[in-house]
Amino acid sequence: MSLDILTINYNDSDADRLFEKSLKNTGFAVIKNHPIDKDLIGEVYKEWENYFSSESKNDYIFDEIKQDGYFPYLTENAKGSTAKDLKEFYHIYEWGRKPHMIGPKTMFLYRELTNVASTLLSWIQKNSPENVSKLFSVPLKDMIYKSQYNLLRIIHYPPLSGNEELNSIRAAAHEDINLLTVLVAGSQPGLQVLDNNESWLDVTTDKNTIVINSGDMLNMASDNYYPSTTHRVINPDPHSNVSRYSMPLFLHPRDEVVLNENYTAGSYLQERLEEIGLK
């Protein structure tokens, strides 16, 4: 069957139940009427558009150990893929470096998204079956408390030049490493989710919504109850070959948080960073 990703009104009385249901069934949910200021999102996008078009972006090359800073075009590949993704991006942490041209609005958005994510984690915790919630080493909301690795990734997918490696796309099929991803609407279409029939489905780009998906760490902590669903970003049609910008917030537990008998959050993160070429 195809995925039935629910669109949920953040303010509805049964929003928590519907959100958990959608995440359980599909690994994704769409939230409307959320508390994030739409003008703020647009202003942050504009600041980063200016950053990526400047030569000074190279003054902030990423730190391989800390993983903050600027990751140039063709740096990252999906797990199991040899082709590099057609994107450049910047990693924002609470403690990390920020470009001089970027004002305080980015960090304000970071904190607003983190607050929403904390609420969403409490919704999952509340509605998880007892046999699932008892698997969590600590409550989900507590996993990210004072985490140093909650990451806002600002992504720029440049227009295609026509000289790209064969079969390379903006973001190859992958699953997210982290616990939960909160994604404000991208500036252009392109995000797709793989359904149970191995068909790719477009995800909404409604600028008044945020898209949520569960990652590998939630999948592991719940013993596969919450799926980490495969998704990708496809290349644009020739008539819409323009830049695309995206801002996912990746919620990461603290390093010492136990996911299952084989992994802590820290050990799994390091393993995956090596697999995708960032270590």
Where are each of the predicted segments found?
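Peripheral, non-catalytic segments flanking oxidoreductase cores
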Residues: M1-K279
